[in-house]
């Protein structure tokens, strides 16, 4: 699965009868949804971008100077003048120079002098700013079912589907082939202040240099460089790249301050680099909160017969995935398609299956299958696939796993924020409380009661509530009632 290859992975486990789960997706992360009686699904935020954003200012990094002219007057002869002074795109400077008999003046003193130079911008020496429009930013969400096929990190799963969202998008339904349909309703949120963000892009001149950065609007507008708006042929403040020398009689030198690319690159050190792909300008941060509908998902292969246990061989022996799960792959030499008999037992309990399958109902197909992912309790375990067996020690502790999943649940609820609550009606408010409980405690509940059936969990919740009602000690009564209520809420809830 896609999530197996990513470091930032989260699990959301639906309770009995789950039809909807709420996910928080961020760039670089991936969420695996597991629910009883449903295929597992990976969901991730693949990209945030805008196509062809609007240009704001263009800056010139290297001036192109031509047609230098100088005019001078003797003392008392009035100001020197050039017609170029009134022309757009020309830089001029007035000054006073020493005049006398040696440079063709009858009087000694200060005479007027003016120098002008035509200024443009060198080719491929511009820095352009682009602004985002929040209404046009596209959020790409991808969905991939766990099919039992091993897919390398650099390969694309044939069952992968894509949904795109903007601020005005409605619910999207994706068809996952034999696994049914999944619906997505996502609320989008950028991770940056778009009103204060500019993408600064340089003309491409060197392959080893980055070409775009994500900068603050005020910093961009304060750049001391010649600038213009798109479509305007003339540059403003072009004198910032031109220097005039000291006047000498009838001569005034004009200097080009040179290429400012190096100065700009030095100023951009440490600034986030922006990614541009064709006409797509990508944002580096942001998230979407998605409500995923699972009601039309269906398990594949439930009617298959069980595979012959003696005809399996390891293709990839069990390996730690890095996400507190174990992954493996087997080959099968018997009749296909069929269901893979897989289980795991803990040390000292040979009759209890402790494996929680992330790949539900693993199968061998005519053209693939055999990849299995499972979660095991900490400690010594034995994994069985048919007649194959493998000793496995799962690191960590049950308590640590509970705290970790609870922490992630709190993070998810924090990111969802105000959208997690509905104060419009009493029913909506209590539904919001239930959803919040599932979001925060769903992972911990599954870690503790993952191998317990629906009826035992229901009876346990009722028993704890009954004890709470019949206990005289107020503290113990409240503790039993609270614990029993949580167990019943997590067991009977239909949302996560």
Curated annotation (Swiss-Prot):
GO terms for cellular component: host cell endoplasmic reticulum membrane; membrane; viral envelope; virion membrane. SUPFAM superfamilies: E set domains (SSF81296), Viral glycoprotein, central and dimerisation domains (SSF56983). InterPro entries: Flav_gly_cen_dom_subdom1, Flavi_E_Ig-like, Flavi_E_Stem/Anchor_dom, Flavi_E_Stem/Anchor_dom_sf, Flavi_Glycoprot_E_cen/dimer, Flavivir/Alphavir_Ig-like_sf, Glycoprot_cen/dimer_sf, Glycoprot_E_dimer_dom. Gene3D superfamilies: 1.20.1280.260, 2.60.40.350, Tick-borne Encephalitis virus Glycoprotein, domain 1, Viral Envelope Glycoprotein, domain 2, Viral Envelope Glycoprotein, domain 3. Residues 1-447 are extracellular. GO terms for biological process: clathrin-dependent endocytosis of virus by host cell; fusion of virus membrane with host endosome membrane; symbiont-mediated suppression of host innate immune response; virion attachment to host cell. The keyword Disulfide bond applies. Residues 98-111 are annotated as: Fusion peptide. Keywords: Clathrin-mediated endocytosis of virus by host, Cleavage on pair of basic residues, Disulfide bond, Fusion of virus membrane with host endosomal membrane, Fusion of virus membrane with host membrane, Glycoprotein, Host endoplasmic reticulum, Host membrane, Host-virus interaction, Inhibition of host innate immune response by virus, Membrane, Suppressor of RNA silencing, Transmembrane, Transmembrane helix, Viral attachment to host cell, Viral envelope protein, Viral immunoevasion, Viral penetration into host cytoplasm, Virion, Virus endocytosis by host, Virus entry into host cell, Zinc. One of its GO terms (molecular function) is protein dimerization activity. This is Genome polyprotein. It comes from Louping ill virus (strain 31).
């Amino acid at each position: 699965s896609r999530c197996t290859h990513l470091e930032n992975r989260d699990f959301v486990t639906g309770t009995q009868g789950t039809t909807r789960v709420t996910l928080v997706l961020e760039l670089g992360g991936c969420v695996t949804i597991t629910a009883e009686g449903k295929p597992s699904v990976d969901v991730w935020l693949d990209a945030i971008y805008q196509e062809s954003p609007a240009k704001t200012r263009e800056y010139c990094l290297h001036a192109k100077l031509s047609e230098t002219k100088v005019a001078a007057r003797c003392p008392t002869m009035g100001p020197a003048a050039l017609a170029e002074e009134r022309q757009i795109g020309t830089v001029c400077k007035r000054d006073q120079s020493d005049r006398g008999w040696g440079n063709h003046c009858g009087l000694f003193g200060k005479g007027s002098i003016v120098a002008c130079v035509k200024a443009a911008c060198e080719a491929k020496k511009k820095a352009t700013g682009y602004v985002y429009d929040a209404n046009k930013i596209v959020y790409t969400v991808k969905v991939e079912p766990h099919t039992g096929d091993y897919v390398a990190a650099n390969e694309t799963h044939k069952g992968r589907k894509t949904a795109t969202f903007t601020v005005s998008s409605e619910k999207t339904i994706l068809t996952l082939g034999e696994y049914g349909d999944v619906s997505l309703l996502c609320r989008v949120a950028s991770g940056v202040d778009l009103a204060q963000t500019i993408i600064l892009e340089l003309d491409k001149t060197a392959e080893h240099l980055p070409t775009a950065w994500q900068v603050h609007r005020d910093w961009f507008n304060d750049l001391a460089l010649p600038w213009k708006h798109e479509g305007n042929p003339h540059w403003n403040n072009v004198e910032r790249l031109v220097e005039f020398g000291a006047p000498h009689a009838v001569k005034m030198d004009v200097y080009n301050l040179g290429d400012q690319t190096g100065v700009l690159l030095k100023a951009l050190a440490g600034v986030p680099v922006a990614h541009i792909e064709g006409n797509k300008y990508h944002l580096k941060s942001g998230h979407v909160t998605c409500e995923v509908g699972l009601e039309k998902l269906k398990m594949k292969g439930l009617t298959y017969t069980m595979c012959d246990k003696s005809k399996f061989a390891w293709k990839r022996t069990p390996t730690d995935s890095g996400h507190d799960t174990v992954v493996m792959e087997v080959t099968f030499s018997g009749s296909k398609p069929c269901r893979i008999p897989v289980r795991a037992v803990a040390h000292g309990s040979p009759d209890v299956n402790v494996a929680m399958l992330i790949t539900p109902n693993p199968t061998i197909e005519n053209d693939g299958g055999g990849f299995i992912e499972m979660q095991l309790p900490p400690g010594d375990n034995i994994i069985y696939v048919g007649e194959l067996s493998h000793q496995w020690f799962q690191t960590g502790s049950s308590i640590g796993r509970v705290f970790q999943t609870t922490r992630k649940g709190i993070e998810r609820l924090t990111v969802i924020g105000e959208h997690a609550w509905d104060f419009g009606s009493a029913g909506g408010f209590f539904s919001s409380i239930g959803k919040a409980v599932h979001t925060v405690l769903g992972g911990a509940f599954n870690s503790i009661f993952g191998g317990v059936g629906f009826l035992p969990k229901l009876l346990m919740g009722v028993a704890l509530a009954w004890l709470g009602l019949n206990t005289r000690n107020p503290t113990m009564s409240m503790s039993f009632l609270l614990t029993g209520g949580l167990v019943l809420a997590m067991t009977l809830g239909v949302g996560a």
